[in-house]
């Protein structure tokens, strides 16, 4: 579970940011936004 949350914590943790790429962060935020959007529209 920590691996999935690392990109979310990356902007707030330099250690996590060093292990993850901007692309990974973008993908995770896109997925979170998509799921959140679907939940809000129902």
Curated annotation (Swiss-Prot):
Ranges that cross the membrane: 20-40
Function: Involved in cell lysis.
Keyword Membrane part of the UniProt annotation: yes
Organism this protein belongs to: Pseudomonas phage phi6
Protein name, entry field: Envelope protein P10
Keyword Mitochondrion among UniProt keywords: no
GO cellular component terms given for this protein: host outer membrane; membrane; viral envelope; virion membrane
Keywords: Cytolysis, Host cell lysis by virus, Membrane, Transmembrane, Transmembrane helix, Viral envelope protein, Viral release from host cell, Virion
Annotated localization: Virion membrane
